[in-house]
Amino acid sequence: MQLVLAAKYIGAAIATIGLIGADDKTSNM
């Protein structure tokens, strides 16, 4: 149960960070 919530939360956070800091952090991967 916690894994699903964590995965969803982390996924949203990564998506937001990716959208916001796309230009700043191009070498994220």
Curated annotation (Swiss-Prot):
Organism taxonomic ancestry: Eukaryota, Fungi, Dikarya, Ascomycota, Saccharomycotina
Keywords: CF(0), Hydrogen ion transport, Ion transport, Lipid-binding, Membrane, Mitochondrion, Transmembrane, Transport
Domain of life: Eukaryota
Family per record: Belongs to the ATPase C chain family.
Function: Mitochondrial membrane ATP synthase (F(1)F(0) ATP synthase or Complex V) produces ATP from ADP in the presence of a proton gradient across the membrane which is generated by electron transport complexes of the respiratory chain. F-type ATPases consist of two structural domains, F(1) - containing the extramembraneous catalytic core and F(0) - containing the membrane proton channel, linked together by a central stalk and a peripheral stalk. During catalysis, ATP synthesis in the catalytic domain of F(1) is coupled via a rotary mechanism of the central stalk subunits to proton translocation.
Record GO terms (molecular function): lipid binding
Protein name: ATP synthase subunit 9, mitochondrial
One record GO biological process: proton transmembrane transport
Self-association and partners: F-type ATPases have 2 components, CF(1) - the catalytic core - and CF(0) - the membrane proton channel. CF(1) has five subunits: alpha(3), beta(3), gamma(1), delta(1), epsilon(1). CF(0) has three main subunits: a, b and c.
